[in-house]
A protein has these predicted regions:
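Divalent metal-coordination and catalytic microenvironments
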Residues: 37, 58, 111, 142, ...
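General structural feature for long, well-ordered alpha-helical segments within catalytic domains
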Residues: 26-33, 46, 50-57, 107, ...
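Metal-dependent amide/peptide-bond hydrolase catalytic core
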Residues: 2-7, 252-426
Length: 426
């Protein structure tokens, strides 16, 4: 791939060389690559086809990608001499053990993408690139994230060959973001942050128009944990609930009363929210069941509340279950802390987007209650995540994340590549 074409002019912005419009041949290739991923979604830690496709394309560009020891996911360096990270310094993080990071502001710039799909059916009935895998879909935009980082890698590899890459860059294609506590731990244990000084990522946002990004300094996502509860009782006849444990009522009370109790035991400004995704019990209308199961998520806005949440939530569940004479077994699964965008890296992304598309292409965004394991990287090095607009301009209908009809305006791929390329060059 060459960037030398009528459509690849260069601009000088703040002394940095920035490639202009991506060559049409590369834009078309990236769209085709994304559509291929979209048609073949793979769940967390099962992304073997996706991993092979990423590795093959990077090798074809003359790079030396390596697959994570877990078997899926890829790490690939550009401009790192002899494979030795530069600017290595001590790691001071508090998340999963990572190995070594660089001192802030030095070392490698890492670009991270997640590569896994979701266990939901693709509901786009007349889409030529809809999922070909039953009950599997790329409904969170990870196919786009992957393509953006891949495309950026191809551009930066060419610029490196031309002597125009001012700093080393690492591409991180991470598996299993959708699986708590996230596949970031595998990437970190495989040295994803060795020598890294800063890290950036994007996440598709169907509420932001394609051609724009959303940015926010400080927390941009929330902490997210998983909650699994089993309730047990002797069961009995629905004619005599007073002689047994009415397990359906007990489960219903857990659903309604636990969030209310928890809401009175933490600061309301913390935004702690419990939302249930599954409640199951019973098989007959006239039989009080002996067993019930509930599962859901616990989300909160700040790190301090996240640290307190397990004890508070578990105590509230026990209280409600005991009140209804139900035995409770609680599995509180730790998930991820909030993604907290560091000021300097947030400004880097802002400057990069403005350099490519003007000040009007950046909008301020609110903190989301969604969880993202990108946060684990930020426990060790400064970084930031931008919301990549994927809504067709003028479109009123929002095809939301984690819904079977989710899709994107594929112009967002070009925008993401331009953003990351400019960030690497500024």
């Amino acid at each position: 791939m060459s960037l030398e074409s009528e459509e690849s002019e260069v601009d000088l912005v703040g002394g940095a060389v920035l490639p202009g419009t991506l060559p049409e041949v590369l834009r078309a290739e990236l769209v085709a690559f994304r559509r291929d991923l979209h048609m073949h979604p793979e769940l967390g830690n099962q992304e073997f086809r996706t991993t092979a496709a990423i590795k093959e394309r990077l090798e074809r560009a003359g790079l030396a990608p390596r697959v994570l020891s877990s078997g899926t996911g890829v790490i690939c360096d550009i401009g790192v001499m002899d494979g030795t990270p530069v600017g290595t310094g001590p790691d001071t993080g508090t998340g999963p053990d990572t190995g070594t990071g660089a001192a802030p502001g030095t070392g490698i710039l890492a670009l991270r993408a997640d590569i896994d799909g979701l266990p939901i059916p693709d509901m786009k009935s007349e889409c030529p690139y809809r999922s070909t895998v039953p009950d599997r879909a790329h409904a969170c935009g990870h196919d786009v994230h992957t393509t953006v980082v891949l495309g950026t890698g191809l551009v930066l590899a060419e610029l490196h060959r031309q002597g125009l890459l001012p700093r080393p860059v690492r591409l991180i294609f991470q598996p299993a973001e959708e699986v708590l506590p996230g596949g970031a731990a595998d990437a970190l244990l495989d040295g994803a942050l060795d020598g890294v000084g800063r890290i950036v990522a994007v996440h598709c946002d169907p509420r932001v128009d394609a051609g724009r990004i959303g940015l926010r300094e400080g927390p941009i996502t929330s902490a997210c944990d998983r909650l699994e509860i089993a309730l047990d009782g002797p069961g009995g006849h629905t004619a005599r609930p007073h002689l047994t444990t009415d397990l359906v009522t007990a489960a219903a009370r857990v659903v309604t009363d636990v969030p209310a109790l928890v809401g009175r035991r933490v600061d309301s400004r913390s935004g702690l929210a419990i939302t249930w995704g599954r409640v199951e019990s019973g098989h007959a209308p006239n039989v009080i069941p002996q067993h019930a199961e509930l599962s859901g998520t616990v989300r909160c806005l700040d790190l301090e509340t996240w640290r307190l949440a397990p004890d508070i939530v578990v105590a509230a569940i026990d209280e409600v279950a005991n009140l209804h004479r139900a035995k409770s077994e609680i599995n509180y699964v730790r998930g991820v802390p909030p993604v907290v965008n560091e000021a300097g890296v947030t400004e880097l992304l802002r400057d990069a987007m403005i350099a490519r598309r003007g000040a009007e292409s950046v909008e301020n965004t609110e903190q989301s209650l969604g969880g993202e394991d990108f946060s684990w990287y930020l426990e060790h090095v400064p970084g930031a995540m931008a919301r990549l607009g994927v809504r067709p301009p003028g479109e009123r209908t929002i095809r939301d994340l984690h819904q079977g009809d989710f899709d994107v305006d594929e112009h967002a791929i070009t925008v993401g590549v331009e953003l990351f390329t400019a960030a690497a060059l500024l």
